[in-house]
């Protein structure tokens, strides 16, 4: 009833969905109690105040249909009749609008006429205040600006060194001019000796300063690289579980590897070339003093370089995008193949997998070749412009020398100066592929860094939990357009109670425990522990006090001791051994040559399935959690391993609230209470013998199937 009542207030439904989109939890009943004073639904003012209370920045605007593509989406289309809906995307090419019908609880695609018929011109734009103050600041090239400001002293030193290098670059052509016009004409050997010594000193200083600049610059960019790498890994581990469930492992790995491209760009010659290019204006002034005509030729070539880059860049970027996509596909396929190597060998499907790999690899190589060809064409175009300018300057310069407007020394000095000007331009043009590549890398890495993390700030860190659990009116789905997984679930679990949860696959058993661990926030209702709403709790505080054992547990490539004591590497050995004994793992660990120091291999490959599972149980017990979840923890074990664990189950459950999820009913028959789920709802609950008395019940049916 409460879910249906909330559905009648579409403003509250919209606020709930937009809050979830911005990774902000809320209690709809609490919002309704505070802001829906007359019980008729949230008014416009009440809606804006409710959004503000959730740290959302909401703004009511009036916008013409033709300008909707300019606003930040999703946004709430406010209707005076209460039939609000969400505007998710505007397709300007096809004049279509992706909306979400809050009343029907389903997405819709509307034509221009259909949208205009229901649009009243009112829109509520919603953004997270965290993004406004920079907590969710977008990762792009502007991210590096604070880093540059932070290390401004080092970059200032680099700038000063660059100024001296440019001064030395000016002196060298002047020396050559003096030698050509004065020394050779007047046979001044003493002057030649002085100039030679001075030139040698300048060259030595230039080499030393150039090396010093490269060192200082590389040192500072390495610091930025370390900061970015650390930020990336912290952010990756802070992302919600839904981020990883919606993406292939290979895609995520490929995006993280783009950090290498950014690193190469930061530590390469591209940025120093940019500095050199900035000082080119000084050279232009000196070159203009020598010959305005020749300088105009050089200046006239610069638009040619720019136009050529503008022509090549979009094509190159598209090809780089395609290259990355194919590289990510290869990465994902490789990770998938290595992970599933046992299945591949068992089914003898290596030829099929190899054939798929060969096709994908050929596609990637072809894409990479197209990038190389286009980059080569771009570089040769730059060379063509450079050679053409050189020929024009040679012809025009020779005419100026013959006519007496320019000396031979001045012509040589001018050509040397023009080389100093053009060199960074050419380097930048040749490095344009790197610029495009790093742009792609920043965008791909932004997919990780721009994804909102789980919110920890402002969350409650409560005292040690006791173990009372309450699910109230829970309604949940994994995506807005996905089917409902849990519907109106109400469940009270008392402290110290052992609860078994059974049901068909897909009935929502594991989803309940994911909500309990706050991996997800329910669309409606509350999950409470000791009366505290988990939507307001710090996820780390919560998860440290819950022990979880899954069907397929992952062990890290470390020693058994390190795996058990993963949450507290410095814990006493006595606690590790006690947890191992409780899990029935101590005996087989003691028989290993290295005992608790045995390296288990990647994902525990050096151990049997039963051994891995018992270590996982020990890992879950070592912190003495007040809530323990066994999610199909024994379903894949042999009977001996399961028997060992079940023998210790009474000790394991002592003083804890335990939730046992199982398909094998023998695992839960001794539970204090058994919950039977079907299609996201609780259909039966009671003790084993009580449920068997209902011969028409689902539990009795499942029990009969297992007996047969």
Swiss-Prot record:
Its main location: membrane. Its EC number is 7.4.2.5. It is found in: Cell inner membrane. Belongs to the ABC transporter superfamily. Protein-1 exporter (TC 3.A.1.109) family. SMART domains: AAA. Changing residue 568 to E: In strain: Serotype A2 / PH196. It is an enzyme of class 7 (translocase). Residues 469-704 form the ABC transporter domain. This is Leukotoxin translocation ATP-binding protein LktB. PROSITE patterns: ABC_TM1F, ABC_TRANSPORTER_1, ABC_TRANSPORTER_2, PEPTIDASE_C39. Keywords: ATP-binding, Cell inner membrane, Cell membrane, Membrane, Nucleotide-binding, Translocase, Transmembrane, Transmembrane helix, Transport. The gene is lktB. In LktB the peptidase C39 domain, the ATP-binding domain (NBD) and the transmembrane domain (TMD) are fused. One of its GO terms (biological process) is proteolysis.
């Amino acid at each position: 009833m409460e879910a249906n009542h909330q559905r009648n207030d579409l403003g509250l439904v919209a606020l709930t969905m937009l809050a979830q989109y911005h990774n902000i939890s809320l209690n709809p009943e609490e919002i309704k109690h505070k802001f829906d004073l007359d019980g008729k639904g949230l008014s416009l003012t009440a809606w804006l105040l409710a959004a503000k209370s959730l740290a959302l920045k909401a703004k009511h605007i009036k916008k013409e249909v033709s300008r909707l593509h300019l606003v930040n989406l999703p946004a709430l289309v406010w209707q005076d009749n209460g039939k609000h809906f969400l505007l998710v995307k505007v397709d300007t090419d096809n004049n279509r609008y992706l909306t979400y019908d809050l009343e029907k609880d389903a997405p819709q695609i509307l034509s221009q006429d259909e949208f205009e018929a229901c649009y009243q011109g009112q829109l509520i734009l919603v953004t997270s205040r965290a993004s406004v103050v920079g907590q969710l600041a977008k990762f792009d090239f502007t991210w590096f600006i604070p880093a540059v400001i932070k290390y401004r002293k080092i970059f200032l030193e680099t700038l000063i060194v660059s100024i001296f290098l440019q001064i030395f670059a000016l002196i060298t052509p002047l020396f050559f001019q003096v030698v050509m016009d004065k020394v050779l004409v007047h046979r001044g050997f003493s002057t030649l000796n002085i100039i030679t010594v001075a030139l040698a000193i300048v060259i030595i200083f230039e080499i030393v300063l150039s090396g010093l600049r490269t060192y200082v610059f590389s040192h500072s960019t390495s610091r930025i690289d370390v900061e970015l790498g650390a930020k990336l890994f912290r952010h990756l581990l802070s992302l919600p579980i839904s981020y990883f469930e919606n993406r292939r492992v290979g895609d995520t790995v490929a995006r993280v590897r783009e950090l290498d491209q950014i690193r190469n760009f930061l530590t390469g010659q591209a940025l120093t070339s940019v500095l050199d290019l900035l000082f080119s204006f000084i050279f232009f002034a000196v070159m203009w003093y020598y010959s305005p005509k020749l300088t105009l030729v050089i200046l006239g070539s610069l638009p040619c370089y720019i136009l050529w880059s503008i022509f090549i860049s979009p094509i190159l970027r598209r090809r780089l995008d395609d290259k990355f996509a194919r590289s990510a596909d290869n990465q994902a396929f490789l990770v998938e193949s290595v992970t599933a190597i046992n299945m591949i060998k068992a089914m003898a499907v290596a030829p099929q997998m190899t054939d798929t790999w060969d096709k994908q690899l050929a596609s990637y190589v072809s894409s990479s070749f197209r990038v190389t060809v286009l980059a080569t064409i771009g570089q040769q175009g730059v060379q063509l412009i450079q050679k053409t300018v050189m020929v024009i300057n040679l012809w025009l310069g020779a005419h100026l020398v013959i006519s007496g407007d320019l000396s031979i020394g001045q012509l040589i000095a001018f050509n040397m100066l023009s080389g100093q000007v053009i060199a960074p331009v050419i380097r930048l043009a040749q490095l344009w592929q790197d610029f495009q590549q790093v742009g792609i890398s920043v965008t791909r890495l932004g997919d990780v860094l721009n994804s909102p993390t789980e919110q920890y700030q402002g969350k409650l860190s409560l005292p040690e939990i006791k173990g009372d659990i309450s699910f109230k009116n829970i309604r949940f789905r994994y995506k807005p357009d996905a089917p409902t997984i849990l519907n109106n679930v109400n469940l009270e679990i008392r402290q110290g109670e052992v609860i078994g949860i059974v049901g068909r696959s897909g009935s929502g058993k594991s989803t309940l425990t994911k909500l309990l661990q706050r991996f997800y926030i329910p669309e409606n209702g509350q999950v409470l522990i000791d009366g505290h709403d988990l939507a307001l709790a710090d996820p780390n505080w919560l998860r440290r006090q819950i022990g979880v054992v899954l069907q397929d547990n992952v062990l890290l490539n470390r020693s058994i001791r390190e795996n058990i004591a993963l949450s507290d590497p410095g814990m006493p050995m006595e606690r590790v051994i006690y947890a191992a004994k409780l899990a029935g793992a101590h005996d087989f660990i003691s028989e290993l040559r290295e005992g608790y120091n045995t390296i288990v291999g990647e994902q525990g490959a050096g151990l049997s399935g039963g051994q891995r599972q018992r270590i996982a149980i020990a890992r879950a017990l070592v912190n003495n959690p007040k809530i323990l979840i066994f999610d199909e923890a024994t379903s894949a074990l042999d009977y001996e391993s399961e028997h060992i664990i079940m023998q210790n189950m009474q000790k394991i459950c002592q003083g804890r609230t335990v939730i046992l999820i199982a398909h094998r009913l023998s695992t839960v028959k001794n539970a204090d209470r058994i919950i039977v789920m079907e299609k996201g709802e609780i259909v039966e609950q009671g003790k084993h013998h009580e449920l068997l008395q209902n011969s028409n019940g689902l539990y009795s049916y499942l029990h009969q199937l297992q007996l047969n």
